[in-house]
């Protein structure tokens, strides 16, 4: 998930997905 982020023009889409997943994981992990 972290690899490649910020290198291609897909950073926006990747960051958006990563953020969503991170939030969901954080909620379940809490």
From Swiss-Prot:
Alphabetically sorted, this entry's keywords are: Electron transport, Heme, Iron, Metal-binding, Periplasm, Sulfate respiration, Transport
Q: What is the lineage of its organism?
A: Bacteria, Pseudomonadati, Thermodesulfobacteriota, Desulfuromonadia, Desulfuromonadales
Which GO annotations describe the biological process of this protein?
Answer: anaerobic respiration
From the record, give the cysteines joined by S-S bonds: none
Spell out the subcellular localization from the entry: Periplasm
Q: Which branch of life, at top level?
A: Bacteria
What cellular-component terms does GO give this entry?
periplasmic space
Report the main location listed first in the record. periplasm
PTM description: Binds 4 heme groups per subunit.
Q: How does it assemble?
A: Monomer.
**What organism does the record attribute this protein to?**
Desulfuromonas acetoxidans (Chloropseudomonas ethylica)
State the name under which the record lists this protein.
Cytochrome c3, 50 kDa
Tell me, in a sentence or two, what this protein's role is. Answer: Participates in sulfate respiration coupled with phosphorylation by transferring electrons from the enzyme dehydrogenase to ferredoxin.
A GO MF term: metal ion binding
